[in-house]
Amino acid sequence: MRKIAVLTSGGDAPGMNAAIRAVVRTGLDKGITVLGIERGFDGLLNGEIFEMTRRSVADIIQRGGTILRTARSEEFKTEEGQKKATDILRVFGVEGLVVIGGDGSFQGAKSLSELGVKTIGIPGTIDNDLAYTDYTIGFDTAVNTVLDAINKLRDTSTSHGRASVVEVMGRNCGDIALYAGLAGGAESIIVPELRFDIDKLCKTILEGKKNGKMHNLIIVAEGAGKANDIAKTIEKVTGVGTRATVLGHIQRGGSPTANDRILASRMGNRAVELLLEEKSSRVVGINDNRIVDMDIHEALSIEGKFDEKLYEIAKALSY
């Protein structure tokens, strides 16, 4: 293995830069040339490829986003686009490709591996929705971003005796809502994995009001409901003033936490090691604080891993 390349694809996540840094510096330490591909698979199709050095990744471990930038590509989803991508990699002499991203990015890596490209995937997505790994890069930072916001919302909700409904990211996975809700002492956590009863929630809010409760904090994953709709219903049924807050893309930004920087560094290092071991079509993950790897087809076939025990703990501590 003499030359490898790295790209970031799909939605950005804090810690991607730390992973890029680890891939580049591990590769250079092993005497490998490392190329950077800008703007994901779209940039690959346009030949946006350059050689990276140690200076290329200096002072980026603390930065959010991705220095390689990211984009989505409709052309790459076609057989012709994937064949074009493999030809471009061959022209540049790339013998191994590291793909940092989420489920869609891994699907792209899988397609390239089936065309003979040696690929390794690193999970970078704030949603934590890849079931084969305990945590994905960016998740911890996103949870802490949400926690900071709900701490502030709790202050103003208490002052006014209101309820706050906070909508966070998570179309199919409620982990951000669950972890931030538990850490922030939310009274209710609404996730796509579990059925939600608005009438029961309103009844609980009324009981709390009768017992002197000064505020209510409800966290909802975007795939489970809309904060504005839930807030309107709560206010109409209970008479309690209720405000909705949609945190949106702020959850993707910001300097990564120590946990995300360390996780990304470990995963990036292992990805290069796997290529040097002549392994391909693998994804890196973490289980029980051990860096592991798995066949990409198997990893993508594993179903969701929602932690119902953690949810029950949050529920027990909520009122």
From Swiss-Prot:
Q: Which residues bind ATP?
A: G11, R72, S73, G102, D103, G104, S105
Question: Can you state which reaction this protein catalyses?
Answer: beta-D-fructose 6-phosphate + ATP = beta-D-fructose 1,6-bisphosphate + ADP + H(+)
The record places the active site at D127 (proton acceptor)
- Write down the SUPFAM superfamilies for this protein, in alphabetical order: Phosphofructokinase (SSF53784)
Q: Does the keyword Translocase apply?
A: no
Keyword Lipid biosynthesis (UniProt): no
Required co-factors? Mg(2+)
Question: Which enzyme class, named as a word?
Answer: transferase
A GO molecular function held by the record: metal ion binding
Q: Where does substrate bind?
A: T125, I126, D127, R162, M169, G170, R171, E222, R243, H249, I250, Q251, R252
Q: From the UniProt record, give the pathway where this protein acts.
A: Carbohydrate degradation; glycolysis; D-glyceraldehyde 3-phosphate and glycerone phosphate from D-glucose: step 3/4
Its biological purpose: Catalyzes the phosphorylation of D-fructose 6-phosphate to fructose 1,6-bisphosphate by ATP, the first committing step of glycolysis.
PANTHER family, alphabetized: ATP-DEPENDENT 6-PHOSPHOFRUCTOKINASE (PTHR13697:SF4), PHOSPHOFRUCTOKINASE (PTHR13697)
Q: What name does UniProt use for this protein?
A: ATP-dependent 6-phosphofructokinase
**Gene behind this protein:** pfkA
